[in-house]
Amino acid sequence: MLGCKGVKSRNNAFERVTVEEEKEYNFRQNFTSRYNILYNANLMLENEERAIFQGTSKNFQIRQSVFDEPIGDGDAHQLMDSLIQKAYKIVNSKQESKYVNEAYLIIGKANYLKGAYHNSIEFFNHLLRTAEEQQEYLPLAYAWKSRALLQIGKTEIANKMVDSAFMTLDDSKATRTFVNAAKANYLLRIGQELEAIPYLEYALESNSKTLDKYRWQFLLAQLYKDNGQFDKALTYFNAISKSNVPFDMAFEASLQRSLLQGGKYDSADEQVRPLLRMLREGKNDGYQDQILFQAGQIYEQKDDIAKALSYFKKSLAQPNRSNYQATETYLKLGDYYFGEKQYVVAQNYYDSVATVLPADYTDVNKVRRKLGYMNEITQLYADIARKDTLLYLASLDEQGRGEKVNTYAND
């Protein structure tokens, strides 16, 4: 009997140890499970951002953006909906509060990437209310909320949110990169280009993502060029043209570099020569319209207007020309002939713009407004010129008037 009790006592002790070990095992298993969910969720978010980048048609002739925005409108999205459900498991379990805020951030980002901006704002708001003990989440939540507000047109509040992100910023390089990029994004969206440049430079300086590195370098090159800082633009275009980037990006960087390097050539013919070599390279098939237009710009820059016009018209004559390039060339010719007071010719080019103007053209609404008022202006000037001609003819004697009419007829 005593032996039996002793055995029973040892069994109880063994059972207690087993229970404790099982609790420890379950804790570790739950910890590992939650960690894996969050790790995989962040990988899924990165993959979705890459998919948005790859799914967006890239035209490097137009102004690039700081971020590629989702094309969805909040409808069902299998991958993001699955991610949201997994993150909800952590939110609902509440066994490890240190992971709940990460889960809320993931859910907010996933809603953003599927285009459900109002939903994403709600989760970023919740994170802002609950992250007092994990303040590293505050700048991220503010910056993401700023992006979402921009997407729904609330620019004033978006500005306040991104400013709040700076007030709560920590030393994390990734966070600093995103917050500076979000500020640059806001400023560009409201048209403050010069103010955006320093923030984009800061974002580039601390950035570790290759995808963003080249995009932001190219955008900075465009911003510097458009704002007259040609040396800085050339530095970035040079770097991009020599980097392992998509062909279209490298091609456009090379074209822009050819225009900005005018100071190193003695003549326009010498500067254009590398472009003419590009015309003969098979890899540039389909890009001849852009190359010829760039050659025209170089001659225009050197005040050789006859050759400039010749190359602009050659660009338009290419059978595989792009609508974007055709728009740019028609506008260039329309503006030239308007300046030369050849209003009918100018209007013909402006009318041609309307037939090819793509929806993604840089400042497309500004171009549409220009076409509207240029039509009115060219008609007005043409009427004035016609009346001036009639008054001039009326001032001549009969013989002189007849000679002048014959001259006009022959022209």
Regions found by a protein language model. Give the residues of each.
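Acidic, polar-rich low-complexity tracts and alpha-helical solenoid repeat scaffolds
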Residues: 4-411
